[in-house]
Amino acid sequence: VRGPLTKEQLEKMGYIVPDIYGDPAILLPLIYNPNVEKKYKYSVIPQFVVEKDFRERFHAENIISMNTNNYKQVIDNIKASEIVFTSSLHGIILAESYNVPAVFFRGLSKSVDFKYYDYYLSTGRPDIKIADTFEEAKKMSPLSIPDLTKLQQGLLDSFPYDLWEYKFWNKWQ
């Protein structure tokens, strides 16, 4: 599960949930991690549901769209940034997974969901700083980037490789 808040909710429903946290996106650097030179002072990743409105209202140096299938381009642009300002949960997760500082802002959506707190708690950061606007975010310092190694290893160790091999690979052999 993503974090302790999800675990708590599932346990209330009667499920047994191990203390293994992490969004699968934290594993991407283990799969795709090119060397990319920094070329942007900052980049902005708006939450996908407000991206169009954000682009119309703000002129940022580099706006990265999460509305794409080209994950390599997204990652390359994040890695090319000195810092990321984002209202997207996966903008935060990807930036931090690639050791790029991220500042979280509510943006046009104005909501802060359970899932954001769940992610931050999974990384050992109960006190998060949230900017209300992009302009406010640019004045803030990012939180320290967490060491995601233990979370990554927990996800890898808990993967049901035996089921994967049996159900999927044996069908095509």
Where are these regions (language model features)?
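Active-site anion-handling motifs in enzyme catalytic cores
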Residues: 1-173
